[in-house]
Amino acid sequence: DKFLSGNLCRCTGYLPIKNAIKNMYSYKSDKFSKSKVIRLLKSIKKTDTVIKKNGSKFFIHYNLNSLIKDYQKISNGHLLVGGTDLALEVTKKRKDLKNIFYLGSNKDLNYVKNKNNNLHIGSATPINDILPILENIYPTFAKMFERYGSEQIRNTASLGGNIGSASPIGDSLPVLIALNSKIIIQGKVKKTLLLDNYFISYRKTKLKPNEIIKEIIIPIYKKNILKCYKISKRIDDDISSVFMAINARIEKNIIKEIKIVCGGLAETPKIAEKAQKFLLNKIFNEENINEAKKIIKREFDPIDDMRASKNYRTKISQNLLERFLNENNKIKSTLY
């Protein structure tokens, strides 16, 4: 089921797909062994490549310097890693993308390092390469990625792609903001930006033309609670109606630190500044959460669309605060 999730079928279900896989056992095995295929692939010499056809160019770079050098020369370049968002520009909007820069093979953008209580993640690192480390540090964040996309998607999708596309319902973005993550942007000069300050408006960011996201820096909070709540019509492989991430430190039932970030309630992932300000240094109880629910209702003005109504989104955001209380409050709540 894990590997079939990328073949989600609303008509026939999984059974015919499973039966087809069982029938494959009658076929002859591949003449190549797995180890031999890996060895052959690794033997291919990695040199920067430009594929040209019909006036379009497809760039493949293996280091950051050569990528930046070529990317600075192109005024209409498109960055590609997993392509789950960029591909829609072609299939849905019928755009002709002339200059594509593939980042998935760039060694300077593919890494995960744990140093000085921070995770340093290359912007093109596949989600599945990050999961083993996240499972030990932020298990709820890692668990969220199981619903974020199928195994096939997670093998190519990246955090840099999520941040670059700037979707208001990108599931990783509220979590990264809640964790006070930073990004390193590389262009003619290198700069570091708090992700809170990255978004300007719908699909607009502070990333300038010919700049790329090089690295994501995620602080490691050892004493905090991190919760990731994804609300969607289907459990797996579905776009969120509402997403809420909460990063909090609670000591002796006092909220010493809290950050609440929502996706799907505004044109960008947005911090619930008024609600979290009210809760800071308050007792973690039903009374204060109920007041925060009133505040968050006034703080956001979501839209009606095909995924959810305005009223539904508002109510869900309130309910998620309530859920956070019930999951983490050591003093029994009377809500249920």
Predicted region positions:
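C-terminal structural segment of proteins
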Residues: 1-336
